[in-house]
Structures are given as C-alpha cells and as structure tokens.
Regions:
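Catalytic-core environment of secreted peptidases
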Residues: 36, 45, 188-239
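Substrate-binding/access-modulating region of protease and related hydrolase catalytic domains
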Residues: 96-179, 202-205, 225-236, 240-242, ...
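Subtilisin-like serine protease catalytic core
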Residues: 16-28, 34-46, 55-106, 122-125, ...
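Structural detector of well-ordered beta-strand residues that form the stable sheet scaffold
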Residues: 92, 158-160, 184, 211, ...
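Solvent-exposed loop/turn segments at secondary-structure junctions
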Residues: 33-35, 50-51, 77, 97-101, ...
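C-terminal subdomain of the subtilisin-like protease fold in secreted/lumenal serine endopeptidases
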Residues: 5, 124-128, 254-314
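Hydrolase catalytic cores
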Residues: 68-71, 92-98, 214-282
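N-terminal domain-start motif of subtilase-like serine proteases
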Residues: 1-28, 51-59, 191-199, 288-290
Length: 314
C-alpha cells in the first residue's frame, strides 16, 4: 500500500497533519463478507448476509475482507505498513457473493435494498461494489441490477464500482460499471491495461471514470490469525482498485461532510492526472488524492453527458 499511496499522491497535509482519515464516514461493502481481522476490529458497524442468512459476520472467500482492508484497514498487524486509504472509516458489510466469489443477481439486489433500508439509520455515505457481470442482450436481470444500483446513487450515496477484468477490448466494462451515474474504476499500470474493462459502453458513455493501480495490492488476509500466519496477502484486479477510490471518497466526505455525491464525482474528475492511455481505458486519468482533497472552488462546468470482476482476481 505504501507504493500505491505514493503513486496516487496520498501523502499530503490533510492525510499527514490534519488527521483526515475517513473518521465517522460509513462505507457499505457489497462482497463476499468480512472477518474480524485485527485491522478492522471495532469498525464493522453493520452486517447482512444475503446468501445464507447467517447473523454472525464471516467471509468464506476472502475477497470482501481484502477489499475492506484496502478501503479502511488501519494497518495494526503490520505497524501501519499496509494501512488502507481511510483507516478510521467504518464498514457496513453486506455479503452478496458465495464461497466461490460468484452469486445471484437477486442476492446482490437484496443487499442493495438492505443498504437503502439502513442508509439513514446507519448514516451510510459510500457503497463499494467490486463485482460485476458482462452485459447480455435483452436480459431483464441486467436491467434490474442496473436499476437498483442507480437507486443507490439517486438516494444520495456515493457509488463506486469496478470496470471489471474482461478487457482490454472496447465495450468490456461490466455491469454496473456501465452506468452513467456511478463512479467506475479501472486498473492502471502495464498489467492492468491487459485486463481492465474498457469503454465506451453500449450506450456510448465514456467509461471508466478514472484508473488506479490494481496489481498485487497487499491487504487483509481473511484467514489471519486463526488459519494463517500471514496478516496480508496480494490480490490483483479492478476489484482492488475500486476501494482505493472509495477510501479517497471517505477522506473527502470527512473533510466536507455536506458534499453531495454529484459534486464529489465532478471534483474527482477534475482532480485526476491525465493518464498514459486513451480515455476508454483510463477515463479522466489517474487518482490524485491531494488535489481531490483540496476542493477549493465549486465546480460548475460538469460535462456529465460526455460521450465517446469487480469480478475478482485476474
């Protein structure tokens, strides 16, 4: 995480001196679940199992715990070396994927509906969706999935989704990352350009919105400490890039608690550094946390209608 943070300009006056750590910001993570990893203990504020209906938190795959660690791990098990983006943010975990990392769209929709139900009570601000499925022609389930994800955005939540690992062909961004409304994250770096989903979408929407390093990102191991001596393990994919942006959004919402999701999205666009590749691969460019946190002037020129896994490990 240290190398990743350097690349995205994480270290700045806000994160180092002003104690901007995501404190008080609740982030819903729709994934394979979560465990009581030492880096997350005490900050898991909600739980729902839409797969098996269990009341006690668990993760039988590891993907969800890894994603949560990138977003909000405090690095306790590694003396801060592997701390996440927003180390004092809180996690509202919703299990929507099974032991194999797959699942049913209806379980994901049920998870979304639960987040909407608990949004005000739990003060949820951000929803991280590091999952996706390729579009299928005239598939009503795809349309329903997209409809409910956009309901999250319309409810005022910052929704961050993965571009998927089905690239690099054009039009390979997965659902729900192909939504005009959500913030869609692709993977940067040489390996990332070989698998990260590329736009434009079938509706000629410019996607992804931005790109972030997603290769061999070290984060929380769901088997630690009971079944493994290793507190952290690496994973690769747009799934890992997505919580980096969710964590950055948590920092911004701590600093500017009244900011709406649309304003945050536009500020994110305008703070990006131009990427090395064309727009269909990196959108508005690469995440620049320091500029994202500056947010000094209200952005009026939004250009929202610009046209032109996730799915798990690669």
């Amino acid at each position: 995480m240290k190398d990743l943070k350097r690349k995205i300009h994480y270290w700045c006056s806000d994160t180092m001196r002003n104690k901007i750590t995501g404190k008080g910001v609740v982030c819903a993570v729709l994934d394979t679940g979560i465990t009581q990893h030492p880096d997350l203990i005490g900050r898991i504020v909600g739980w729902k199992d839409c797969v098996q209906g269990k009341k006690t938190i668990y993760d039988d795959n590891g993907h969800g715990t890894h994603v949560a660690g990138i977003l909000a791990g405090n690095g306790k098990s590694g003396r801060g070396l592997y701390s996440g983006m927003a180390p004092e943010a809180q996690i509202f975990a919703v299990k929507v994927l099974n032991q194999r990392g797959g699942g049913k769209i209806r379980d994901v929709i049920n998870g979304i509906r639960y987040v909407l139900l608990k949004q005000k009570e739990m003060k949820i601000r951000i929803v991280n969706i590091s999952i996706g499925t390729l579009p299928h022609k005239k598939n009503p389930e795809d349309e329903l999935f997209l409809f409910w994800v956009e309901r999250l955005w319309d409810a005022g939540l910052v929704v961050v989704t993965a571009a998927g690992n089905k690239g690099p062909k054009e039009g390979s961004v997965t659902i729900p990352g192909n939504s005009r409304k959500v913030i869609t994250v692709g993977a940067d770096e040489e390996l990332g350009k070989k698998y990260s989903g590329c736009g434009p979408t079938g509706d000629c929407i410019k996607k992804p919105d931005l790109a972030v390093p997603g290769n061999r990102i070290y984060s929380c191991n769901y088997l630690y400490p009971v079944r493994s001596p290793y507190a952290y393990i690496p994973k690769t994919g747009t799934s890992m890039a997505t919580p980096v942006v969710s964590g950055a959004a948590a920092l911004v919402l701590q600093k500017y608690p009244d900011m709406c999701n649309l304003e945050l999205k536009y500020r994110l666009w305008n703070s990006c550094e131009k990427g090395r590749y064309y727009d269909q691969r990196q959108g508005h460019g690469n995440l620049h946390v320091e500029k994202f946190l500056e947010c000094q002037e209200k952005i009026l020129d939004t250009n929202e209608n610009l046209l032109y896994d996730s799915t798990g490990d690669k």
